[in-house]
């Protein structure tokens, strides 16, 4: 719970939020220790490290966004009720007026803390510029599948089946960002699946949009098994298994969500139920919006 006291409390709260954000960014992904990757070429290692860093950055921003939203709602309610109490209490009651002033001051300090420690941090990466170009949609899919196999799928014995009949269709968008988004979806699906499972990737056209759906059978045991190779940190895997409010996604999927939105598209995650089929769906317009 955030402290509302002036001075030390405010500084401590700010430091706590920044430390939490840093841990999200630094600890989200751990490099696999499976011997399968011990002799990977330097270029592949560098690319995978870059992909993990990108996912960690987007996840940090997503968590900060949730913190900002979820804390502001009760703070606004407290502030509103303070005014209601002010009209009900005796203006001559010095103790009551001091209490109300303390409530308002505490709320204002917490809002300032959110602005300084959360909103300013998010502002650095809030906008997502796109390097648009025309490309065949099969290209980022091929790249993402190859990178996902190197990152974790081969170590898990996971098969990735690609279904596509429109690889030559061209899309106007950020090819690299979309490849990162698909890679994140594939890695998440692999993490969420039992070893030696098969996950599917279907690339298709739908109402002037490019649609990518990754399907898998969720296994909570695989998510939590420390003996299995993992690309995600334990806290990220644990959060992914928690119930979600309608419209919200697992933190680990913040990158595809942001990339889809930047292209004027959508990203959806179905309910994650142990032992049942789940899906991740990304849609982006074929032409710039």
Predicted regions and their residues:
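Short acidic helix/loop segment immediately C-terminal to the autophosphorylated histidine
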Residues: 86-94
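A conserved beta-strand-to-alpha-helix junction within the catalytic ATP-binding
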Residues: 131-146, 179
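Glycine-rich ATP-binding loops of the HATPase_c
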Residues: 264-272
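Conserved catalytic submotifs in the C-terminal HATPase_c
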Residues: 131-136, 159-169, 176
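Short conserved segment of the HATPase_c
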Residues: 222-237
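Short alpha-helical segment of the dimerization/phosphotransfer core of two-component systems
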Residues: 105-110
């Amino acid at each position: 719970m955030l402290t509302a006291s002036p001075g030390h409390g405010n500084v401590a709260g700010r430091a706590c939020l920044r430390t939490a954000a840093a841990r999200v960014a630094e600890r989200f992904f751990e490099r696999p220790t499976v011997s399968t990757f011990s002799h990977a070429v330097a270029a592949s290692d560098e690319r995978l490290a870059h992909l993990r860093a990108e996912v960690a950055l987007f996840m940090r921003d997503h968590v900060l966004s949730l913190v900002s939203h979820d804390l502001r709602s009760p703070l606004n309610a407290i502030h509103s009720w303070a005014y209601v109490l002010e009209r009900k209490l005796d203006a001559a009651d010095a103790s009551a007026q001091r209490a109300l002033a303390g409530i308002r001051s505490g709320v204002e300090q917490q809002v300032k803390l959110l602005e300084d420690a959360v909103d300013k941090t998010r502002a650095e990466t809030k906008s997502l510029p796109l390097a648009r170009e025309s490309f065949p949609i099969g290209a980022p899919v091929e790249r993402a599948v190859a990178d996902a196999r190197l990152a974790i799928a081969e170590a898990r014995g996971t098969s990735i089946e690609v279904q596509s009949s429109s690889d030559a269709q061209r899309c106007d968008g950020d090819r690299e960002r979309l490849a990162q988004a698909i890679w994140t979806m594939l890695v998440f699906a692999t993490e969420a699946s039992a070893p030696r499972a098969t996950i599917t990737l279907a690339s298709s056209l739908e109402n002037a949009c490019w649609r990518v759906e990754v399907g898998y059978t969720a296994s909570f045991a695989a998510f939590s098994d420390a003996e299995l190779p993992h690309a995600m940190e334990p806290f990220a895997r644990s959060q992914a298994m928690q119930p979600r409010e309608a419209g919200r996604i697992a933190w680990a999927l913040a990158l595809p969500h942001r990339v889809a939105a930047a292209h004027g598209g959508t990203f959806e995650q179905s309910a994650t139920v142990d032992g049942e089929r789940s899906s991740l769906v990304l849609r982006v317009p074929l032409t710039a919006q």
